[in-house]
């Protein structure tokens, strides 16, 4: 647990010393610690009436305040993220659009300030996207019908531990939670907490700083080929071991049935804001949340397995193009996008450029099969007639491309030069097939750069 201590209200504060301490703490955490978010589920069967009313009111007041910020920003000259977070009352409207003034009873001023920051970040994101050209026009932020998260900024002030329970500000009773054992990490330091409302219940997401873990690599290189029929095909160079991993999370019958009911109501122009519509929407969200949790679990297990390798090589596949070309359902039911997004951030990952022909080359004789179609599952070399599985062959080629690129000087590693390098090697092999391939590669790489000393001591092919 954290040993954070705070001065009492009676003692004078040395702001310069506090600022210096914050800078030192931030530098120490950046160099020695990782940020992790642990999710604890509130035990809904142990809630009394006061706690239930608090959980209902805090999200309701958060919605009122968020919408009041948007309304404040629609007045000319005002910005939505500069709304007064210290005001003790908020104006909202009933179904007949009559104004009602209510007092904040559950949502603290610090939480309201966090909502202001969230709105400011959203405005900044919209502005930058307009400037870059990702979006052409926008109406700005709009009013919302619900808010599903509330931030508690400061540990031991806005939120704290009460034994094995969690106490939130403005709530007299602490909450019993599942998953408290996750926090038993040596040297852990707590930052902020976030109360989240999901279809499956209420959760508290605790942001922590934990000491960095040193992963023991197995000094092996693995190539990963993404696909639709087979989600992932892996090849380990040192052991010549290949695997085919398929992940498909189908919609349950309950989810399909609920989706049909909602679609039928929409076709008959019934509102989904009625009691029945809201009940069906909640059921659908709960079933989708369950499927999303299954995908997340499979993704975490696969990423944990990949972290043990010294080098992970994969190609930056264009999944959005796959989705638009008739493979949308397979992409939606799989975990390709999730795995790609996480693995790209790992320190032991090397990402190949998306336009490299990883399936068409055969690196033993360095010939290219130009007639290979997307639907063909076998690779046949036009020169030596070797027949191999297409996906395993692509995973092997990714490691070969990685080794080839690592031999090239850093200033010559742009995609255009790499493609010219491949064409040059292929031509030289055709002219003199008896010459060793490694010697040809070294000659071509030395010709890329005038600094021949940069190619001294090249790794062997």
Each predicted region: which residue ranges?
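Generic detection of short hydrophobic beta-strand segments and adjacent strand-loop junctions
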Residues: 36-45, 171-183, 243-250
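Acidic carboxylate diad motif detector
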Residues: 87-198, 333
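Long, hydrophobic, amphipathic alpha-helical segments used as structural scaffolds
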Residues: 70-77, 123-134, 210
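Short amphipathic alpha-helical coiled-coil/interface segments
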Residues: 59-62, 115-123, 280-291
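Gly/serine-rich nucleotide phosphate-binding loop at the start of the catalytic core
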Residues: 2-114, 460
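Positively charged, helix-rich recognition surfaces that bind polyanionic ligands
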Residues: 3-9, 200, 204-461
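Stable alpha-helical structural segments in soluble proteins, enriched in small hydrophobic residues
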Residues: 69, 114-127, 392-402
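Catalytic micro-motifs at enzyme active sites that drive phosphoryl/nucleotidyl and oxygen chemistry
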Residues: 28, 190-194, 207-214
